[in-house]
Design a protein with these regions (language model features):
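Periplasmic alpha-helical coiled-coil/stalk elements that build and connect Gram-negative outer-membrane
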Residues: 31, 40, 47-163, 274, ...
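A glycine-biased, small/acidic residue-tolerant capping/turn segment at secondary-structure junctions
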Residues: 148, 290-315, 339-356
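Sec/SRP-type N-terminal targeting helices
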Residues: 25-53, 79, 103, 107, ...
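Extracytoplasmic
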Residues: 14-16, 128, 162, 196
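Small/polar, glycine/serine/threonine/aspartate-rich low-complexity segments that form flexible
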Residues: 1-20, 143-160, 189, 202-242, ...
Length: 371
């Protein structure tokens, strides 16, 4: 409505439509090293998640089988309690009849109280393990399904012949440390490449017009090709500092990897030695259980024949139950040690990223070897 000469300025509309492409020749491998470092970091994070999952699985299994061991010992404690109650009743009767001194009845009551105390402790341990199991599973104790007592699993007495480096190398924490070293190596390569010239080229093509109606005409076409050369001349100090940091991070990653491997080897050796010791103790304990079972059978036979009273067979039964309880404890230790050994060996973890990389390398070699 008002002419532009009276306003002191003018305006116009401009329409632009285009695309831009930039290509870095990456002669020194900086971009490739940066990409590989990021991928290695992602693989390390995945391995760390697997390590956390393995730790959780081990805690759940160890707590569950600990609860089963408490249940097995509670069953033996019930039998021991019934045996000791029967023995205490006989002792009280003999004191009333004047056959024994009151001290014998007091001894029987003390032994009965010891069995009752052990049973209360086992009940408390089972309840604590159940609460711990619910916490590990992320549910409230009342939401945990009802657990049923089951026999403890059989544990093979021995360890795999290849329980050394072959299986240790599968541990997720070692895999994570290895990927961290790989990432640090790639970051060091990228920092080294910063010292060399960087050549890139940019291309732009599109349409530009101050008249929207003429945007798609031939006269509105634009094109530009711009080469660029970066010479790291004036920032040598910063590049040296960055390279020094990368080298320090690489040294730290290597030290962490060495520490992880040594710790894993020590853990496996400790658990394997513990498994061997428990296996030897279980052999001795089975002999003691069998011997005590034979003593119980002999005492029961004498009681049936009237040669001895029932107290001898009750004492023999109490001792037999004690030996069985010790055997259950050793079996529980064997299960716990076996679980710890499985965890120390990586729990069957396989580094899929490393396997894929090895498969790709094998395929490349095979393809290159074909005529």
């Amino acid at each position: 409505l008002i002419p532009s000469q009276f306003l002191g300025f003018s305006w116009y509309n401009q329409a632009d439509l285009g695309a831009q492409l930039k290509y870095d020749f990456d002669w020194w491998g900086k971009q490739r090293a940066t990409l590989e470092a990021a991928l290695d970091q992602a693989h390390a994070a995945e391995a760390q998640r697997s390590a956390a999952a393995l730790a959780l699985q081990y805690a759940v299994a160890d707590t569950y089988f600990g609860w089963q061991a408490d249940q097995a010992r509670l069953q033996l404690a019930d039998q021991a309690l019934a045996t000791q109650q029967q023995f205490s009743r006989i002792a009280d009767l003999r004191v009333k009849q004047g056959v024994d001194l009151p001290d014998e009845a007091q001894k029987a009551r003390a032994q009965l109280a010891a069995v009752q105390e052990m049973r209360v402790a086992l009940e408390g341990s089972a309840k604590i393990r159940r609460v711990s199991l619910a916490s590990l599973l992320g549910v409230a104790p009342e939401q945990l399904p009802e657990l049923q007592p089951r026999p403890l699993p059989r544990v093979d007495e021995g360890i795999p012949a290849n329980a050394a480096l072959d299986l240790i190398s599968r541990r997720p924490d070692i895999a994570a440390s290895r990927w961290q070293v790989e990432a640090a190596l790639r970051q060091t390569d990228a920092a080294r490449a910063e010292f060399f010239p960087d050549f890139s080229i940019s291309a732009m093509a599109g349409l530009s017009s101050i008249d929207l109606g003429k945007l798609f005409t031939a006269g509105s076409r634009t094109f530009a090709l711009t080469p660029a050369l970066h010479l790291p001349i004036f920032n040598g100090g910063a590049l040296k500092a960055n390279y020094g940091v990368s080298k320090a991070q690489l040294d730290a990653a290597i030290a962490q990897y060495d520490s992880t491997v040594l710790g894993a080897a020590r853990e496996v050796a400790t658990q394997a030695l513990g498994a061997q010791q428990i296996a030897a103790r279980r052999v001795v304990q089975r002999t003691r259980v069998d011997a005590q079972r034979q003593l119980l059978a002999n005492a029961q036979a004498r009681a049936a024949q009237g040669v001895r009273d029932a107290r001898e067979s009750l004492v023999a039964k109490a001792q037999w139950l004690q030996q069985r309880d010790a055997a259950v404890q050793l079996q529980a230790q064997a299960v716990a040690t076996d679980l710890a050994l499985v965890k120390a060996l990586g729990g069957g973890y396989r580094d899929a990223s490393a396997a894929d990389r090895n498969a790709d390398a094998t395929s490349s070699v095979t393809a290159g070897a074909r005529p």
